[in-house]
Design a protein with these regions (language model features):
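Short acidic low-complexity segments
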Residues: 98-110, 287-288
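Tryptophan-centered motif/residue detector
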Residues: 96, 137, 437-440
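Short amphipathic alpha-helical segment within the helicase RecA-like ATPase core
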Residues: 77, 87, 118
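A generic structural signal for ordered secondary structure
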Residues: 95, 106-109, 145, 222, ...
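Internal gly/pro-rich beta-alpha loop/helix module
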Residues: 111-113, 118-198
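Small-residue (G/A/S/T)-rich helix-start motifs and N-terminal tracts that mark the onset
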Residues: 1-82, 90, 165, 176-331, ...
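Hydrophobic beta-strand residues in large extracellular and virion-surface proteins
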Residues: 75-77, 99, 169
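Conserved nucleotide-cofactor-binding alpha/beta core module
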Residues: 87, 91-96
Length: 476
């Protein structure tokens, strides 16, 4: 894996590794030993002062201390709190011969090296409490060398501890573009290769439920499709609802609206065009976009490929780029895209199967289609759907989603995936995180559905299991 990880992705991949059978103690041991090895090369003589925070970053520090002591080093340990938050970190702490708890006025001493294990990449915002006080305590003492564990504490805020060197794990982190990280060493972790693929850890990015939330605050989606195939937008809408989105509007030609069987939770938008969407529908959809605050739009399911319809889809996609509304481009709407080009300014996800991707990309790699403007690294994704979903994002992001059941290779399941992605985008997830979680949840839901229905599985059987699969891996 080559992309720069953010703090959410680190937690996701740690959880995926644990689900694959990797013990937290093994991860901590590997991190601490790598840290100790670097420390020994930086300060072969003299005392090494290790500052440990209350989390797993502190646990890495305790492992490093044990390793250094075993090989004859002189180590002084100071913890920010009386105990660690996690059992594994606490178990390593109790193995250390002596751990001081920091208090104001504590003597700094004359260490040859300070190891910063106060905070890892999981911190959001500036350091607080004892951690902030310890950083203020360190700075005037001006230690000769500082080695950071994973990332310098407080990096990116006004209160941080600059490092001469940093040992980070598995891959560099986004904040490491700062000069204050010093020389960076990337140490491996005992993660199986599939750790980076979609997995249960992706549920950590699912937006938590606000107890005071009102109707509509979990997202509003517009689905544009239908015409020759009225069932596809309905399936997409059902998936968006079952993945937690509040309000789902489905815009179709009036004859398609009249033919469809409408679930109670979907809101029909009956467009004037009778059988397929064209210029008049474009104007109606523009009006909808102006009148209602949609958090995400899905265009394509069941749309058809008439020239008038394709032209309409192209203009709507351009409008969505202007409005900066996250968008999922699926099925027939992919034929509205210019060859080998991502729509300028658009944030979102495209979900082509192999044939659609060949038509759109020709000889271009998906990563080349995405690359262009200066935008956040999680803003664009191409999901090549199939027996193995292949997800390509910006700046080297790539992963796969495996598993599920082969009976999910049936008509309508692609519409479900597109709807699930749109539902997550509407709830505020980034295109990259939404794509990963939607792909994983669909695989789990597909397995549940296949176990219930066997050879008779239909795409319409899947949506209730989307909710069950999501519930199994989230805290809600």
């Amino acid at each position: 894996m080559t992309w720069l990880l953010n703090w959410r992705e680190v937690a996701v991949l740690d959880a995926n590794a644990e689900a694959l059978g990797v013990k937290v103690s093994d991860l901590m041991a590997a991190a601490g030993k790598a840290l100790a090895h670097k420390a020994a090369t930086m300060a072969p003589e003299g005392e090494i002062l290790i500052l440990c925070g209350p989390g797993n970053n502190g646990g890495d520090g305790f492992v490093a201390a044990l390793e250094l002591i075993e090989f004859g080093g002189t180590v002084r340990l100071i913890a920010s709190h009386k105990s660690q938050k996690g059992e594994v970190a606490q178990s390593f702490r109790t193995k250390c011969p002596s751990v001081e708890v920091w208090k104001e006025g504590c003597d700094f001493g004359t260490p040859s090296l300070l190891i910063d294990c106060l905070l890892g990449v999981g911190l959001k915002g500036a350091p607080r409490g004892n951690i902030a006080k310890m950083i203020d305590w360190v700075k005037p003492n001006n230690p000769p060398l500082v080695l950071a564990c994973d990332i310098p504490s407080g990096l990116g805020s006004k209160k941080f501890l600059a490092a001469d060197a940093t040992v980070t794990f598995h891959a560099e982190k986004q904040d490491m573009l700062y000069i204050d990280v010093g020389e960076v060493t990337v140490a491996p972790l005992p993660w199986p290769p599939e750790t980076v693929n979609c997995g249960p850890g992706d549920a950590l990015c699912y937006p938590p439920l606000d107890p005071s939330a009102h109707k509509g605050e979990r997202g509003r989606v517009l689905i544009v499709g239908g015409g020759p195939y009225h069932g596809a937008p309905i399936l997409a809408g059902r998936a968006a609802a079952r993945i937690g989105c509040d309000l789902i509007h489905v815009a179709m030609p009036r004859n398609a609206v009249d033919r469809a069987t409408w679930p109670d939770h979907l809101i029909p938008e009956r467009l004037f065009d009778e059988d397929h969407l064209g210029e008049r529908a474009r104007d109606e959809i523009f009006k909808l976009l102006d009148e209602k605050s949609f958090d995400a739009v899905l265009i394509g399911p069941g749309l058809g490929r008439l020239e008038e319809t394709t032209n309409m889809a192209r203009e709507i996609i351009e409008k969505l780029s202007e409005l900066e509304i996250p968008t999922v481009i699926d099925a027939d709407a992919i034929y509205a895209l210019d060859e080998g080009v991502w729509p300028k300014g658009l944030t979102g996800v495209a979900t082509p199967h192999a044939q659609e991707l060949r038509m759109w990309a020709w000889d271009e790699e998906p990563s080349n289609i995405l690359a262009a403007e200066d935008i956040p690294s999680e803003s664009r994704v191409i999901i090549r759907t199939g027996s193995v979903d292949q997800l390509t994002g910006l700046e080297g992001r790539y992963c796969e989603c495996i598993g599920g059941h082969p009976r999910m290779a049936t008509g309508g399941t692609g519409d479900l995936l597109a709807g699930a992605v749109a539902g997550l985008l509407a709830q505020g997830m980034t295109p990259w995180s939404a794509s990963r979680l939607a792909c994983y949840v669909m695989r789990v839901a597909g397995m549940m559905t296949a176990n219930e229905f066997g050879p008779g599985l239909l795409a319409s059987d899947v949506p209730p299991h989307i909710a069950r699969a999501l519930s199994n891996i989230t805290a809600d």
